[in-house]
A protein has these predicted regions:
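The feature captures the conserved acid-bearing segment of alpha/beta-hydrolase catalytic domains
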Residues: 1-48
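C-terminal catalytic histidine-bearing segment of alpha/beta-hydrolase fold enzymes
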Residues: 40-141
């Protein structure tokens, strides 16, 4: 997706309030940016929900996982994620802008961290998310 163009289809983001792997705040900010630009983007945060809350039988567990949560990147990728003719890129957390591959390649490792991630099924949130997604899909037909 080119973050600077109109989206080809509506998006509905299903976010867990306590997701410590894919943090909800950057997703919410991105959705709000898209919506402010006139795109049909919405989200819902499910209270108490962790990462993978929508799985049926995920028992509570902590995993030591790698992620890139130390940055929040907005990257213009004209032809997809593997196209390195992108630019510019902007880290919303630091305010730093990148205009070439060398700068980008030197910075990205600073975004990486390993942290403990909580996962657990949440039946109530999952059931509501399914209803919300079905309503969203029905609304775009």
């Amino acid at each position: 997706v080119d973050h600077h163009s109109k989206l080809p289809a509506p998006i509905f983001m299903v976010l867990g309030e306590k997701d410590d792997m894919t943090l909800p705040k950057p997703c919410m900010e991105l959705a709000e940016e898209y919506a402010a630009a006139g795109n049909p983007v919405s989200y819902k945060v499910y209270q108490g929900a962790t990462h993978v809350f929508d799985r049926l039988t995920m028992l509570w567990k902590k995993h030591n996982e790698g992620n890139f949560n130390l940055c929040s990147m907005d990257v213009r990728m004209p032809y997809g994620a593997n196209d390195r003719s992108w630019g510019p890129a902007h880290d919303k957390y630091s305010g730093k802008t990148f205009t070439d591959n060398a700068e980008w390649n030197a910075y990205v490792p600073k975004c990486r961290q390993t942290s403990w991630v909580t996962v657990e099924s949440n039946e109530k949130a999952r059931e509501q998310a399914v209803k919300d997604v079905l309503a969203f899909l029905k609304g775009i037909q």
